[in-house]
Regions:
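Surface-exposed patches in mature extracellular/periplasmic domains of secreted proteins
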Residues: 45-55, 68-72, 152-163
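Short, mixed-charge amphipathic alpha-helical segments
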Residues: 42-47, 127-133, 155
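Non-transmembrane alpha-helical segments in soluble domains
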Residues: 38, 56, 143, 164, ...
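Acidic helix/loop microenvironments that form the catalytic cleft of cell-wall polysaccharide enzymes
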Residues: 59-62, 155-173
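Extracellular low-complexity, O-glycosylation-prone Ser/Thr/Pro/Gly-rich "stalks"
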Residues: 172-189
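Peptidoglycan-targeting cell-wall enzymes and recognition modules
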Residues: 2-32, 36, 55-145
Length: 189
């Protein structure tokens, strides 16, 4: 199943304007973004209306409808302590948290996750972290994460809360994710 730009606009009413505001998507159009989403979706098994609905709900919330593909916060909270270590960053105050803050449509966070994605994609996103915020990197890394966490399975059984926890590490923004999901279900199913 392929999605259309009309469906994306019905699910994320601000997507077109937000793409223009996203500094990493400079010059991109909604047509081009739609084409990229469709280009990579099959590779990652996002091929049914239900899977698309769940995937789009998560990325709509995480990116504020494509407005941001880089975490707004500085990333300092990932720089020291147990959280830094869990994410593969060094526990020293050396800037790893800021360097490996969340990027992509689903905010890939931490040196460990960047290194794992690098193994898959072949681009050195550990050294060139900004690649994860640019269109291809933002889209592919979110779909890679989706497959890595087996989120298609949870989409198939309509487990929005579980998908949210696995995408976000908690239930942050659950009501908004549900709103996007319900809208996507109406549009796609």
């Amino acid at each position: 199943m392929k999605i259309t730009k009309e469906q994306l606009k019905a699910i994320m009413p601000n997507i077109e304007g937000n793409i223009k505001k996203n500094k990493h998507f400079a010059g991109m159009t909604l047509d081009e973004v739609t084409e990229l989403l469709n280009k990579y979706a099959e590779e990652f098994g996002i091929t049914t209306p239900r899977r698309w609905a769940h995937y789009l709900a998560q990325i709509a919330h995480e990116s504020m409808e494509f407005r941001y593909t880089e975490e707004i916060a500085s990333g300092a909270k990932y720089d020291t302590g147990a959280l830094a270590v869990r994410l593969g960053n060094t526990p020293a105050k050396d800037g790893d948290g800021q360097k490996y803050k969340g990027r992509g449509l689903i905010q890939l966070t931490g040196k460990y996750n960047y290194a794992e994605y690098k193994k898959y994609c072949g681009f050195d996103v550990v050294k060139q972290t900004e690649l994860l915020a640019k269109p291809i990197g933002a889209i592919r890394s979110s779909m890679w994460f989706w497959r890595k966490k087996n989120l298609n399975y949870y989409a198939d059984i309509d487990a929005l809360l579980t998908i949210t926890k696995l995408s976000n590490g908690g239930t942050n923004g659950y009501s908004e994710r549900k709103k996007y999901h319900d809208r996507a279900e109406r549009v796609l199913v």
